[in-house]
A protein has these predicted regions:
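Non-catalytic structural scaffold of enzyme domains
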Residues: 1-174
């Protein structure tokens, strides 16, 4: 997972991957990672002469679905620190209350296979405990997090809609 890594290292790794892809004469690159999208997309688009497409930050979906005008944004530490989800949401509705929550171990839990178990539920309650009942939308700001969507749904009950940005399309700008 890239979330705990410094932005410079994330950019370096991503450039190495793109350089490798260019050896195969690719015509475009889709960044299927929120951390890379929010931290590196403009630099990558400037460096490479092919289309570089990032993840959608789901601001329009939140705007349409949130009746309380209150949303939790779950992401890696690097994704939350970049502030791009918050910026995108405030660009759509300045009255929206957003709770950016860095979920330090979600990606590692998923990679270790802790889905639907007590460790997953413990982590979900740790990160979402303070906003349960406050928010009516939860944005999954990392491509690992949909694996924990059922755990999040169980914890939040029917009080919140889960938005998986994989289904919101892609974005040219973070």
């Amino acid at each position: 997972p890239y979330g705990p890594r410094p932005v410079e290292e994330i950019l370096l790794f991503t450039e190495q991957m793109i350089d490798r892809l260019l050896e195969s004469d690719v015509k475009a690159v889709v960044l299927a990672c929120n951390t890379i999208t929010v931290n590196c997309l403009p630099a990558l688009q400037q460096k490479y002469m092919i289309p570089i497409i990032g993840m959608n930050l789901a601001a329009e979906a939140v705007n349409q679905l949130s009746e309380k005008r209150s949303v939790a944004i779950l992401g890696t530490a690097a994704t939350i620190a970049a502030g791009k989800h918050l910026e995108a949401l405030q660009g759509v509705d300045t009255d929206l209350r957003a709770y950016p929550i860095p979920c330090y171990d979600f990606a590692a839990l998923v990679e270790a296979g802790h889905i639907g178990d007590s460790q997953a539920m413990s982590a979900v309650s740790q990160y979402l405990g303070d906003v349960r009942g406050e928010v009516d939308v939860v944005v999954l700001g990392c491509t690992h997090y949909p694996f924990l969507a059922k755990d999040i749904e169980v914890f939040m009950g029917d009080t919140a809609t889960i938005i998986d940005p994989r289904y919101c399309g892609s974005s040219q700008k973070p």
